[in-house]
Each structure stands twice: as structure tokens, then as C-alpha cells.
Amino acid sequence: MSHSDYNFDIEQNAFEKEAPKVSIERKGDVVEEEVIATGEVENYAEPKSRNFLQRFFDDFKPALTTRGDGVALKRKLTSRHMQMISVGGAIGSGLYVGSGSAFADGGPASVIINYILIGIMMIFVIYALGELAIAYPVAGSFNTYATRFIDPAWGFAVSWNYFLNYFVTCPLELTTCAITFKFWTEINSAAWISIFLAVVIVINLFGVRAYGEVEFILSTIKVIATVGFIILAIIINCGGVPTDHRGYIGGSIIKQKPFRHGFKGFCSVFTTAAFSFSGTEIIGLAAAEVGNPRKSVPSAVKQVFWRIAIFYVVSLILIGLLVSPDDPRLMGNGDVSVSPFVLAIQEANIKGLPSVFNAVIIISVVSVTNSTTYTAARTLQGMATLKQAPKFFSYTDRVGRPLIAMVVVLLFGFFAYINEADKNGSDISDTVFDWLLAISGLSSFFTWGSICLSHIMFRLAFKKQGHSLKELGFVSPMGIWGSVIGLGFNILCLMAEFYVSLFLIGGSPNANDFFQGYLAACIALAFFIGYKIYDRSHIPSLDKLDIDTGLKTYDNQDEEKEEYSSKGPLNILKKAWNAVC
């Protein structure tokens, strides 16, 4: 069989000048799907008749198409996957579980105000990310943007900070799964950790398509459950549940103690709210593996507003109306910890339903664990392609899995078994996990702030070098000022966390608690200074900033004519729908 039996379709990659996108097709059948790749086709083996085991083991071999840095991520995510990743991706333990400690620390009014503020900030961040992701749909996404548009040293610091955030989250989420099961039984937590770790490993072994399908299913369940809870909570508040002897509740609970622990309590909720929204930016990473980012990413970005408005703000307002922040069962108030969502249902004396929602919480935690593994592995691989991590982490197999990076992340998941060390009466696991959280605690603020700053630098350089916004496939309606506001919000949140870390709620300043709250900032600064000394990188001027390499431009006028070819009311409705969805 000769090369004449194959058609090679090579297209310029989205980010590298010498980075063709290669699809190899044999006459009569497809040998390889399109991949994000650069460089040359290497080590091609002619397709043969193979059984399942042969195909399975061959899939772990180096990718058929590789580039100099070894990346060959496949575009296997569809618009359907992107929609659910954006809507349900961050509906997880941060909302269902973490919000309990926020109510205990700051009270319902602080929670509602802070989540609205962080939600507004996230809208600015995600629209900026959407614009960049369409222009440069690359592996590494926003970490790559920070390296290119801000400073290589800062990109290095943010990338490692972001990776560590998701790297340490895997065992933490597995532990949350085990704790959540204690609602029903006191079975050894190691058993539950083993089960869920095995599930996550299997999902990731099947590659990005499996990740997309699993997230689609789990996110659908989370969305349905949250909408169902909102409807039920309204009925409970209005006194429509026969088993709830409290009758009409209205605002009687929230009026009792809207704020807890004063200004300190208010500031403390910032970090909890940020943790809840953590993961929203994953759509930027997924842009490198979606078939048509020009159509899929903008739609996913627009869905973020509705998710924030409905799933976060509305549900937390209803929690504030139904659950007292002084309840000792609330997470953060005592030894017996229950999700505020489950607690709201329990208070209405509805039998069976608390168990159903607790199961939904477990599903959401599995979803978050799956997403953290996906994100950490892709981030580590992206860093390796930029020479910010050892090169072997860029290894990608034939089905598009960043195999070595993925294995390292999954192996760290076994760290969750440290919970078993507490059986002898010690609290070693609490201490270890507190410091693991400290390593990653502020990562989201650095990442989101960097996205905004990257967008600002990109826009300024884009204008300086004579480009028009009409060349872009998607333009953030918030503009450059939206990114300025988003960056300011992130700086404000970092200041608030510094204040809370230094002046503890109910305690005096001490080094241990301060570094548990602010260690991530120290680590990011150390990464930045260390790389700056090593690489002696500098920030280029706007007129010299390279924005042309790999920039994907679009003829938006032709696309709009095709998309809105119909006239009349139908066209108006179509435009209105696309503006918000």
C-alpha cells in the first residue's frame, strides 16, 4: 500500500505558524479523525484487521499525527457537550456543599450579595475568554494567553497555580463523596473512595468523547434536580407542603440574622463563592477539543449568565429563606454536616426526598472530580507544550488522551486514602487537606484576573496594529471595559481574602491560619520571580505583541447573511434567541 492510497488534508493550526491541522483519510474509509496537531505525520502504520484487544493497546501508542511538542488533542466535543459543560460544569460541591459554610460564616444576606457580585464578575471573565478562545482555540487556553499576551513568567506562575488547584482537588472531591455517604451509613469511607476513583479512572480511559458524554448526562441530572429544588423551595416557603407545620415562612428566617460575624463574615464568603464558580472557565480548555468552536463556544458563553442567575442566585435566595445560619447541622457549624439543600427539604418533613437530593449531590461531586481530572491533565499537557513543564507530559496517544499527564493526576487521587489515618484518633487528614486547600485556594482569582488582563492586552494590541473587531469570530459585548471591571473585581477579592486571613473570624492573627488562607498567593509570586530570574522574560510593547500567529479570522458578514436569510418575525426571534442563548 502506497501514499497514493491516502488523501492528506492539511490546514493551518489555530495558534502556531508551523502547526498544520491534519486529517488522514484512506480511500473508502477514515483512518484518523481530525486532530489539533503541528509538525509532521510520523510513524504511520498501515491499518490492518485487528481485534478489540489489539485496537485497545494500539490506542495507547503515540498519536498518529504529532507536532514538535507532541500535542494531538482531538476535536470530539460537540455543541451539545459544550452547552451542558457550560450550564452544569460548575454546579457541584461548591454550590451544594460549600455554600453551607458560607451561610454559617457570613449569613444569608452576605451569601446572596457575594454570589451576585462574583456572578457579575464571572460574566465579564467568560465573555472575555469566549472572544480569545474563538480567536485562538488552542491547547492550554487561558494559560497560553497569559504567557503570550501578558508575560511568560506570569503565564508560568498562573499555569502552575491553576494546575495545582485542580491537581489537589481530585482527592478532596473523593473525600467529599465519602463524607456525603455518611448521610445514610457509616461504612468505611475507603470503600466509597475506591468505587468513585475507579469510576473516574474508567471515564478518563475512554478519552475526551467519554468525558463529554458523561458530563452531558451528569449535568442534565444536576440541572433537572436544581430546577426541581427551586420549584419545591417556593412551595415550601409559601406553606404548600402538608407535612411542614411551619406554614407560610416568607422572610421570617432571613430577617432573624441576615449577616453573621460582621464585615469579616461578609469578606469570608468571597472565597467560598469563588470556589463555587470554579470550573466555569473549563469551556476555554474545551474549545481546543470541540468540532466547531466558532458556533459552539459563543453559545456556551451566553449560557453562563442563565446558570448564574437561575442556578446560583435564585437557589441560594431560597436557601436563605428556608434555612437558619445558626442551625448546628449546617456545614461549618458543627460535627454533623448536612448540605443546606438537603437541610431545607428535611425541615419540611418530606420523607425520602432528602435521600434523593443527597444522591444528586454525590452525582455532582463525581462530575466535579471527572472535570478536575480532565482539566488538570490538559493544563499539565499545555504547560509541557510551552516548555513550562517536563516535555514528556505532552505525550498524547492515538485517541487524543494526554496519557502521562492524566496518569499522574489520577495517581494523586489515591491520596484520598489518607482519611484512614484518622482511625487512631489523630486528625492528620484534616491537617493535610487544609494545607492542600491552602496551595490552591486563590487559584481562581489569579486565573480569572489573568483572563481579563490577557483580553485587555489583546484588544489594545489588536487596535494598535490596525485590526478591526469585524475580523473576530466572536466579540465580547462587554468590551475592554468589561475586562477592566472583571480584573478590578478579582483584585478586590484578593484584598478581602488577605483581610480575612490576617484577621480571623473569632480568633486573633497567627501565621498558621494566615498562610492557610493566603499561601497560594505566595506560591504564585515565587513561581513568577523564579521564572523571571531563570528566563529573564520581558513584556513586549503593544506594537510588537504577536497577535497574528495563529489568529483565526472570519467573514462575519457572509455568515450572518446565511444565518439570517429568512425575513419577517421568524428572523427577529432567531436574532433575539441567539443574542441570549
Curated annotation (Swiss-Prot):
<feature type="transmembrane region" description="Helical">
    <location>
        <begin position="485"/>
        <end position="505"/>
    </location>
</feature>
<feature type="transmembrane region" description="Helical">
    <location>
        <begin position="84"/>
        <end position="104"/>
    </location>
</feature>
<feature type="transmembrane region" description="Helical">
    <location>
        <begin position="399"/>
        <end position="419"/>
    </location>
</feature>
<feature type="transmembrane region" description="Helical">
    <location>
        <begin position="514"/>
        <end position="534"/>
    </location>
</feature>
<feature type="transmembrane region" description="Helical">
    <location>
        <begin position="109"/>
        <end position="129"/>
    </location>
</feature>
<keyword id="KW-0029">Amino-acid transport</keyword>
<protein>
    <recommendedName>
        <fullName>Uncharacterized amino-acid permease C359.01</fullName>
    </recommendedName>
</protein>
<keyword id="KW-0812">Transmembrane</keyword>
<dbReference type="InterPro" id="IPR004841">
    <property type="entry name" value="AA-permease/SLC12A_dom"/>
</dbReference>
<comment type="similarity">
    <text>Belongs to the amino acid-polyamine-organocation (APC) superfamily.</text>
</comment>
<dbReference type="InterPro" id="IPR050524">
    <property type="entry name" value="APC_YAT"/>
</dbReference>
<feature type="transmembrane region" description="Helical">
    <location>
        <begin position="304"/>
        <end position="324"/>
    </location>
</feature>
<feature type="transmembrane region" description="Helical">
    <location>
        <begin position="149"/>
        <end position="169"/>
    </location>
</feature>
<dbReference type="InterPro" id="IPR004840">
    <property type="entry name" value="Amino_acid_permease_CS"/>
</dbReference>
<keyword id="KW-0472">Membrane</keyword>
<feature type="transmembrane region" description="Helical">
    <location>
        <begin position="216"/>
        <end position="236"/>
    </location>
</feature>
<feature type="transmembrane region" description="Helical">
    <location>
        <begin position="348"/>
        <end position="368"/>
    </location>
</feature>
<feature type="transmembrane region" description="Helical">
    <location>
        <begin position="266"/>
        <end position="286"/>
    </location>
</feature>
<feature type="transmembrane region" description="Helical">
    <location>
        <begin position="432"/>
        <end position="452"/>
    </location>
</feature>
<dbReference type="GO" id="GO:0016020">
    <property type="term" value="C:membrane"/>
</dbReference>
<dbReference type="GO" id="GO:0015171">
    <property type="term" value="F:amino acid transmembrane transporter activity"/>
</dbReference>
<dbReference type="GO" id="GO:0003333">
    <property type="term" value="P:amino acid transmembrane transport"/>
</dbReference>
<keyword id="KW-1133">Transmembrane helix</keyword>
<feature type="transmembrane region" description="Helical">
    <location>
        <begin position="187"/>
        <end position="207"/>
    </location>
</feature>
<dbReference type="Pfam" id="PF00324">
    <property type="entry name" value="AA_permease"/>
</dbReference>
<keyword id="KW-0813">Transport</keyword>
